[in-house]
């Protein structure tokens, strides 16, 4: 079995479906004997360029270990899911379980937002 990192971008109007999509893809991997090493929901972010006249989209990253057939099934699911705008699969040398630099940035932004809301208005 090989290690893969999959990043997919979901239409912003379908953001409420993201948890169900993550569970579906995790279920596909585990049902076929694979392992999900890391799941990161990066949230709604600004895209580098417009896709279907959209400036923002919901980003998700999965690090999995699976065989080629499972990967093909997941990628086929992406192609037939209209909510998925783009996806990218990268073969990795080993399993990545530590938070990605992108997730660290998301956590830092969330901490800054919560700190601003907790500060009393003067």
Swiss-Prot record:
Keywords: Ribonucleoprotein, Ribosomal protein, RNA-binding, rRNA-binding. It comes from the Bacteria. SUPFAM superfamilies: Ribosomal protein S6. Residues 106-122 have a biased composition (Basic and acidic residues). The keyword Glycosyltransferase does not apply. GO terms for biological process: translation. The keyword Ion transport does not apply. InterPro entries: Ribosomal_bS6, Ribosomal_bS6_sf, Ribosomal_S6_plastid/chlpt, Transl_elong_EF1B/ribsomal_bS6. One of its GO terms (cellular component) is cytosolic small ribosomal subunit. Residues 96-122 are annotated as: Disordered. GO terms for molecular function: small ribosomal subunit rRNA binding; structural constituent of ribosome. Binds together with bS18 to 16S ribosomal RNA. Belongs to the bacterial ribosomal protein bS6 family. This is Small ribosomal subunit protein bS6. The lineage of its organism: Bacteria, Pseudomonadati, Pseudomonadota, Betaproteobacteria, Burkholderiales.
């Amino acid at each position: 079995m090989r290690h893969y990192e999959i990043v997919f971008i979901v239409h912003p109007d379908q953001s409420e479906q993201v948890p169900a999509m993550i569970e579906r893809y995790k279920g596909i991997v585990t049902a076929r004997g694979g392992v999900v090493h890391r799941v990161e929901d990066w949230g709604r972010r600004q895209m580098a360029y417009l896709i279907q006249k959209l400036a923002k989209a919901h980003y998700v990253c999965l690090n999995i270990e699976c065989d080629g057939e499972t990967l093909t099934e997941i990628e086929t699911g992406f192609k037939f899911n209209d909510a998925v705008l783009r996806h990218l699969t990268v073969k990795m040398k080993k399993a990545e379980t530590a938070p990605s630099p992108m997730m660290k940035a998301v956590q830092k932004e969330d901490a800054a937002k919560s700190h601003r809301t907790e500060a009393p208005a003067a």
